[in-house]
Every structure is written in structure tokens, then in C-alpha cells.
């Protein structure tokens, strides 16, 4: 078993499904929190579980530098190392290498660059990126790719796209030859595939509750109750567990090159496909145009992953047009800077007007932060540089993102996604 993808409901291009990995079931469309160094900043793993997170991201480049792939492998891979028994996705390190533009040299073989920590020389290739990701042991890993800058000349984009296609073939070849070396190895129970979407406990009964989430008046199943169990059921039939390698479509802002990249990546053959190379400085309107165009060329029966994109409005809109998986550092990064997402708009909690505001951060949010703490207290923590400020802010922002996706899934299932999205996109900034 690597992954299984099941589509449960559709409405236009939007779809609701479940993605089954060796470590659990994930409802799609899904937002995946980013845990760059095997840690979602400010939130311990038990709270992530409480929030209903069933998949998170790790960063191959950063984990390769510290603590090192060998140390993670010895602990049983990322799952054992970070005490997380739910699903994990790792990127290939390609985007991080791209961001080190002054320190890298790209060739057919791979990329020479220098560590951002100590300047030591490093080399990543499709083979070494696969070796690292197999050692880290995520459920879903990514082919090694090259991301082009924005703006970029067409010939530069074409050359990079073709290189990415050749690297994808090399990535798959190495992965197929070495995938048996995954650190958790052995067998994983795969009976999670039989669990219904609305049941966390695997009994088959509807255990979902209803409460407002994501927007005022939207009654949707709560995440903790609606999310499928992230662990396996007793008595399941063991199946050989392997990782799943996704291909990445590149091509910059050139729609015809995106089509060519999609066709070549599909020809190589992967169980899932990602759209990469966006959120690199282009206008948001251009991002959506590229995403919509690229989705037209991707298989409808495979999960589609949009990499590194997402305000709450954007993840809802991209779910509407057929994206299944999204990630972004925005909710955690914004939280550390006092920017909070609410059903009434974005709030900068550092503003003095909240000094005596005893109301909840978001009266329409059911997260533990909004249930317990006032805006005045959150403002005080942030103004005082208390670590707790970042923790509470991050918990709320992640809750808001996860609630948004839960509401999106619920609306799509009921055929109401257009109504829901119009409410999301009209939120003001406060």
C-alpha cells in the first residue's frame, strides 16, 4: 500500500474525497500545516491532533541539514522522531534550493549550493533527494524539481521545465529501486480505507456534531468529530506499506509549457500530481489563471496538490476549482506577527484599540482560544513579547484554516460551494 484516493462527491470541478496513506485517512480537500523542522511552530503534536490535523509537512532541505537524515531514520523516520502517528508529506528541497539563488549552480546532474547555516558546500540531485526522503519516511514524498523565478524569460522557463521532467523520471527510477528502505517498513494496517468520512471512531456511526465554523451561520461537522481516525482499526488485514511519490508540474507563467509539463509528468506516471513554482512574486490573478489551466491537464482520479499557496480565501477558491491538497506557512507566520484570521476579517492584534476589548477574538469561532481568551488579553501577550502569544495566535489561525476547509468540504458535499465561497471572499480586513 502507498496511497488510495477515493472521490466521494463532486460539484462542478470541486470534489470531496479521502486520501488513505499507511498512517491514516485524510479528508480532501485538505489544508496541510507546515512543520519545516518536524515542528509546527508553537503547537505540540497532541494539540495538532486535537485540532484535527491528519497530515502535515516536513522540509527535506532543512531536515537534511539538522538533525540529519541518519538521525531521523534511526528514530523510525519522522513519525517516530517527532512522535506523530498520522500522515506526513515532505517536499524534495527543490524550492528551498531555488530560494538560495545567490548560492546555487544548476546542472543536468543536480544543484550545487551552500548551506544557509554555515556556508558548507552541498549537492542535491534527484537521486539524493529521493534517498533523503526515503530516509525521512514521510507517507508522501515529492520528485526533485527546479522552480523558476518570476519574472523569467520564456526560454529560461522552457529549459527549466524540461530539466524538471528529466529529473522526475530519475526521481521515479531511484524511488522504485529503493522504496523498500523506508524506515517504518514492515506492515501497516490498511483497514482505515473502510472508515466512513463522517466517523472518527471507525464504528460506521455518524459521530459528527454541528457548530458554526469558517463563517457565521455555517453549520458543519466539527473537525475533531468529522475527521476519520488517523490510526488503524484492530483486526485489520496487514498490507505492505510503501511511500507514495508525487510528480510536480512546472512551467512558470507559460500556460503551454504548463500543459507540456503536465503531459510529460503524467507519461512518467505518479499516484498524485503537484502544481509547483507559484507564489514566487506573481500577481494573484496570474496564479489562479495558471492553476485553472494546469488542472485541466491533470488526471481527475488522482489527488492534485497546489504547493505553497493559500490565504483562507484562496484555499477555498482553489478547492472550488478542483484542488485536493494545499499547504502554506501563512497561518503560522502571520500568527507570529500578530495577524489573525477571523470570520469578520483579518485582525492585527497588536493595535492599541484592543487594549480594553473584552470580547472573544472571533465570536463565530469555536477554537479553544476564542472560547477562553479576550482580545485584550491576546493583545497584552503580544505587546509583552510573551511566547504564549505566538502559541495562542497560531492555534487560532490553524483552527480557522482547518474550519474553513471543513466548511468547504461540507458545502461541496451539499452542492453549496458557490454560496459558501461568496461569503468567504467578501470578508473585510479589520
Which ranges hold each PLM region?
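Structural signal for hydrophobic packing residues in well-ordered secondary-structure cores
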Residues: 137, 168, 172-175, 179, ...
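Glycine- and acidic
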Residues: 149-154, 158, 272-278, 387-390
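Non-catalytic, usually N-terminal nucleic-acid engagement modules in DNA/RNA processing proteins
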Residues: 1-184, 352-355
